[in-house]
Amino acid sequence: MRAEKRKKKKKILYTIIALIGIFVLSTGSYAYYLWHKAASTVANIHENINKSKKRDSAVDIDNHDPFSVLLMGVDERDGDKGRADSLIYMTVNPKTKTTEMVSIPRDTYTEIIGKGKMDKINHSYAFGGVQMTVDTVENFLDVPVDYFIKVNMESFKDVVDTLGGITVNSTFAFNYDGYSFGKGEITLNGKEALAYTRMRKEDPNGDFGRQNRQRQVIEGIINKGANISSITKFGDMFKVIENNVKTNLTFDDMWDIQSGYKEARSKVIQHELKGDGTKINGIYYYKADESSLSDITAELKESLNK
């Protein structure tokens, strides 16, 4: 099933890049400082991965080639390497003016590439970091991963507090981790925002509902961040980004995407990976429906080849 959603706030890739792009595109008396600080920050968060074996040649952003990106929300804490609790695969095609995306449930049962075993897909990060996660997602969806952006979910609270709080629209009221969240428009501080993104067992949509709340928080951060006027807050944001974000996108890549791929925001298509929950040796897993997975793979490949 495909649900088409017009641009407005459903620009998941662009919200992540815009977290840095806000600084890149800033104007005013300190624009020169921000430009160089942004470039320095991107250089510090850069992390290479192997070129996809599913690509004959590398993607050319300058030529406006369609590309893919894997968004990884990692729940890392002190003394714990963490797991990839949010995996969103996206294709971006400026020629068809379309961005396509699929959220992969964290409990999805699949082969962990490089580990030689079947397990939950989010365990791939704990076993082998970014590279093993990328390899596993490529194998599961049978599509290339050109770029990745990894964000430590713990950093949400630091970002939100730096911005002075954010506003989200909760679809239902619930309690979690000592916090109460009402239905409708609510304002969150850092710790509240983190708790808001973590609850899933009481959500009628399970992990899909949790992923939606994560996107709400990201969008709230961008909306608030777009109005930053204090150079002190800019400095604090750069520090948070350096400590909590990794990507193989370069500063030039980000600039080219912001300027050359704008039309790909015209239409966002979100695919739903159907499946069922099951238990194997007493452990819960999400088993993707083979027909649904095959259809999504075909759609993603078509998006990358147009």
UniProtKB/Swiss-Prot annotation:
Instruction: Give, as one word, the top-level EC class.
Output: transferase
Q: Which residues lie on this side of the membrane: Extracellular?
A: 33-306
- Tell me where it resides: Cell membrane
* Ranges annotated as spanning the membrane: 12-32
Q: Name one GO molecular function term.
A: phosphotransferase activity, for other substituted phosphate groups
> Which GO BP annotation is one of this protein's?
cell wall assembly
Its pathway is: Cell wall biogenesis
What is the similarity comment for this entry? Answer: Belongs to the LytR/CpsA/Psr (LCP) family.
Official protein name in the record? Polyisoprenyl-teichoic acid--peptidoglycan teichoic acid transferase TagU
Q: Which organism is it from?
A: Bacillus licheniformis (strain ATCC 14580 / DSM 13 / JCM 2505 / CCUG 7422 / NBRC 12200 / NCIMB 9375 / NCTC 10341 / NRRL NRS-1264 / Gibson 46)
